């Protein structure tokens, strides 16, 4: 399934302004805003957070599947897709990221 098709299956994110990712100490390490060019990543991360309660290795693996064709592009072009790169990092390090949603 393509990323565009996958997005159609994910819960709506109209109620979200952003999502923050937190390190193990609770500090914000990233913010994904609900704006053009980022809304797809927000939808993926919000769905992962709803299913897993956090972004851990299992959630990151699922996220790479959800990002579909963009995952291969991210592997070939490190830095081009920072929200996918972050999932690779979680898998490699075994880290767990907390998630805080910001209402619209």
Where are these regions (language model features)?
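Short, charge-rich, low-complexity alpha-helical interaction segments
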Residues: 4-27
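Generic hydrophobic, helix-prone segments enriched in Leu/Val/Ile
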Residues: 7-10, 59, 66
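Context-gated lysine
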Residues: 8, 35-38, 80
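Generic structural signal for hydrophobic core residues of well-folded globular domains
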Residues: 10, 48-55, 71, 91-94
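A generic short-segment signal for beta-strand/edge and adjacent turn/coil regions
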Residues: 15-17, 58-59, 71
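Amphipathic alpha-helical interaction modules
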Residues: 20-57
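Short, compact, well-ordered microdomains
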Residues: 61-104
């Amino acid at each position: 399934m393509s990323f565009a098709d996958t997005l159609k299956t994910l819960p709506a994110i109209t109620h979200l302004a952003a999502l923050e990712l937190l390190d193990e100490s609770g500090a914000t390490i990233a913010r994904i805003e609900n704006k053009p060019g980022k809304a797809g990543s927000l939808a993926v991360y919000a769905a992962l957070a709803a299913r897993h309660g956090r972004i851990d290795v299992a959630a990151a693996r699922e996220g790479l599947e959800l990002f579909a064709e963009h995952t291969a592009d991210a592997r070939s072009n490190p830095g081009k897709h920072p929200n996918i790169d972050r999932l690779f990092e979680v898998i490699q390090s075994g880290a767990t990221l907390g998630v805080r949603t910001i209402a619209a």
